[in-house]
UniProtKB/Swiss-Prot annotation:
Reported function: Catalyzes the ATP-dependent condensation of GlcN-Ins and L-cysteine to form L-Cys-GlcN-Ins.
Residue ranges of the motif 'HIGH' region: 69-79
Annotated family: Belongs to the class-I aminoacyl-tRNA synthetase family. MshC subfamily.
Motif 'ERGGDP' region, residue range(s) on this chain: 207-212
Binding site for Zn(2+): C67, C251, H276
Cofactor: Zn(2+)
Keyword Oxidoreductase attached: no
SUPFAM superfamilies per UniProt: Nucleotidylyl transferase
Name of the protein in its database record: L-cysteine:1D-myo-inositol 2-amino-2-deoxy-alpha-D-glucopyranoside ligase
Source organism of the structure: Frankia casuarinae (strain DSM 45818 / CECT 9043 / HFP020203 / CcI3)
Length: 464
């Protein structure tokens, strides 16, 4: 009966099923990408599903989907480190000659958001808007490449419902009371991303938004597709009654709508490999009848503070906005993040920022010199390191070596040479309009900007 009803209602045009006004979410302004001589190398990156470093072999256009924030608190350094991973992946792919179609979602309706809004006496939409605005500011300051589509779950409700309808028609969904669940028995590849045992899955599922103990489910691991309306909660009309989507189906539907077919990377933090990426891939594969959902599943390691993973629930957070308000140069903060492999957990300490500021000062001093060692070797080295599983620390070390040689040749003086902000005419043979006062330092400034996203322009005092 349920399936027949959904088939009938799914024939109705979306505008008749959803009498709501949806506003398209806007991303932040993307920093410019400047050209470099030659082309970069193909990206080899660690794929969680195969537990190996594999060459990403996209078509002309690479398709990336990265899970975004739940906007109930400010951006912390764990978030920043995660999004840096996919910023670097985009830069490497673009440098290798690919176009990149990058989609990121925002979970702008979810239990943690609703709970925080209730606790603070705020409208949940106002809280989400405030934190999304702050996230945009942080991403802009850190010079993260913006997604081509920045999509809120609320605006994606129609496409999410359409995918739920497909899953019902394929016999992959069932009711528990008024809620809809997905049957993992219909997804033969379930578990092949995270490679966890069933006991591990059950334990993690309970910790990360699942409800394995709910009675009436066919399998304790079956994830929620559609949560029927509860008093005091937001809801939207659908063929199966008012409610709101489950967490995992949101990304499945948004990724398919904006990227289609098989995508090249599904990305996020390591804490998303299960259940989120496992379930969202299962939804997409069963709905479309196509496997795999993604060619590579890429996960960024965790950042700790005081011995524990940074998390909103624990409250051990270092916020990007707080550091910016304290006067920290965002370029130095980005450089501190770049000094860590995306596959390795690490701990944040204030000393890391001090080291990054010192490094930034040396880099800026070196590119301000009138001349320096040949930079083409450095360009090749940075490309080599980043193409090898986004080895940002290796790329940073290569720049350090060039900077050390440049400063040594100049006698270690940071004041040598003309004003680095003066731009002369272009010099031929360097791949673009590099300043005439020094081809090598100018190329280094350009490659550090383009490949690492670090702006080596000197910081000017406010009001100057």
């Amino acid at each position: 009966m349920l399936s027949a009803t959904l088939r009938l209602l799914s024939l109705c045009p979306p505008e008749s099923r959803f009498a709501v006004t949806l506003t398209r979410m806007q991303a932040w302004p993307s920093p410019p990408i400047r050209s470099l001589p030659g082309h970069g190398k193909p990206l080899r990156i660690f794929d969680t599903a195969t537990s190996s470093v594999r060459e990403l072999a996209p078509a002309v256009t690479a398709r990336l989907y990265v899970c975004g924030i739940t906007p109930y608190d400010a951006t912390h350094l764990g978030h920043a480190f995660t999004y840096l991973t996919y910023d670097l992946a985009q830069r490497v792919l673009r440098d290798a000659g690919h176009h990149v179609h990058y989609v990121q979602n925002v979970t702008d309706v979810d239990d943690p958001l609703l709970e925080r809004a209730t606790r603070d006496g705020l409208d949940w939409r106002a809280l989400a808007d405030r934190e999304i605005d702050l996230f945009r500011e942080d991403m802009t300051a850190l010079r993260m490449l913006a997604p081509d589509a920045y999509v809120g779950v609320v605006e994606a409700i129609p496409m999410i419902v359409d995918m739920v309808v497909e899953l019902v028609d394929r016999g992959a969904a069932y009711q528990v009371d008024d809620d809809l669940y997905f049957s993992i028995a219909t997804a033969p590849a379930f578990g092949e991303i995270s490679h966890l045992s069933r006991a591990e899955m059950l334990a993690i599922c309970a910790e990360r938004g699942g409800d394995p103990r709910r009675t009436g489910k066919k399998d304790p691991l079956d994830p929620l597709l559609w949560r029927a309306h509860r008093p005091g909660e937001p809801s939207w009309p659908s063929p199966f009654g008012p409610g709101r989507p489950g967490w995992h189906i949101e990304c499945s539907a948004i990724a398919r709508h904006y990227l289609g077919g098989v995508i090249d990377i599904q990305g996020g933090g390591t804490d998303l490999s299960f259940p989120h990426h496992e379930c969202s891939a299962a939804h997409a594969e069963v709905a479309a009848g196509i496997r795999p959902f993604a060619r590579s599943y890429v996960h960024t390691a965790m950042v700790s503070l005081d011995g524990h993973k940074m998390s909103k629930s624990r409250g051990n957070l270092e916020f990007v906005s707080r550091l910016r308000r304290a006067g920290v140069d965002p370029a130095a903060l980005r450089l501190a993040l770049l000094d860590h492999r995306h596959t390795e957990d690490w701990e944040w300490t204030p000393g890391l920022l001090d080291d990054a500021v010192d490094r930034m000062n040396r880099w800026r001093a070196a590119v301000a010199l009138p001349t320096g060692p040949d930079a083409m070797g450095l360009l090749a080295a940075v490309r080599e390191r980043l193409a090898d599983d986004l080895d940002a620390p290796g790329a940073v070390a290569a720049v350090d070596a060039w900077v050390g040689a440049a400063l040594a040749d100049a006698g270690g003086s940071a004041g040598a040479g003309p004003d680095p902000t003066h731009q002369g005419g272009p010099v031929r043979g360097s791949g673009g309009d590099v300043p005439a006062w020094g081809e090598a330092p100018a190329l280094v400034r350009r490659l550090v900007d383009t490949l690492l996203g670090v702006d080596l322009e000197p910081v000017r005092p406010r009001g100057s």
